[in-house]
């Protein structure tokens, strides 16, 4: 990993750790930068806002690639659901635990509601582009991507708030419903 990547990961780790310890609202960008051993200006070169430290989604590219690889004749809703299922099934146990921790922080921080919506817009756009690349029309692609992301967001936040199920079970249930299984 190059210097930029190491700094980016150090900032993400520092932010997630502080958010878990103190809560999102009680953590400042200066504290994140200090914990990572960099200046606050460096933090803002990597993440334009504090919410991006928590909400920046590293899964969008792999989900979009999996959707693009789905059969061209597959319905858009099923293609998105199955592409996401395939992408997320490759998560390590460490990534699953980190995702649950991150989602718990998001679920508890009321000030992040608008940030979640903005972040979801980026995910919807990535999935919409993948569907269009497979041959779907723009309106169909937008509706399918938006529906799946909204449903998946609800399922993931519910999963994060409870200890009753595994990520795999929560995803399977949500994606089965969304994909029409």
Where are these regions (language model features)?
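Basic, helix-initiating cap at the start of DNA-binding domains
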Residues: 1-22, 26-41, 55, 62
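Amphipathic alpha-helical packing segments from all-alpha helical-bundle domains
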Residues: 109-134, 142-146
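Hydrophobic alpha-helical connector segments
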Residues: 64-101
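C-terminal peripheral helix-coil segments that are non-catalytic and often amphipathic
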Residues: 129-132, 164-181
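Amphipathic C-terminal alpha-helical segment
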Residues: 145-164, 180-181
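Amphipathic alpha-helical segments enriched in hydrophobic/aromatic and basic residues
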Residues: 19, 28-29, 50-56, 77-80, ...
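N-terminal intrinsically disordered/low-complexity leader segments
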Residues: 1-4, 103, 175-176
């Amino acid at each position: 990993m190059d210097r930029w990547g190491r700094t980016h990961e150090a900032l993400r780790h520092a932010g997630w750790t502080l958010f878990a310890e103190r809560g999102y609202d009680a953590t400042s960008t200066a504290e994140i930068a200090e914990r990572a051993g960099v200046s606050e200006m460096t933090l803002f070169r990597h993440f334009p806002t504090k919410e991006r430290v928590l909400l920046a989604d590293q899964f969008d590219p792999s989900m979009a690639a999996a959707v693009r690889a789905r059969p061209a004749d597959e319905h858009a809703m099923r293609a998105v659901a199955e592409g996401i299922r395939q992408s997320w099934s490759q998560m390590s146990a460490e990534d699953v635990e980190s995702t649950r921790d991150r989602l718990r922080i998001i679920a508890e921080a009321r000030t992040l509601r608008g940030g979640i919506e903005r972040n979801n817009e980026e995910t919807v756009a990535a999935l919409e582009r993948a569907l269009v690349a497979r041959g779907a029309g723009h309106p169909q692609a937008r509706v399918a991507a938006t529906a799946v992301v909204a449903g998946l967001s609800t399922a993931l936040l519910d999963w994060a708030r409870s200890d009753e199920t595994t990520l795999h079970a929560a995803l399977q249930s949500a994606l089965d419903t969304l994909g029409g299984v």
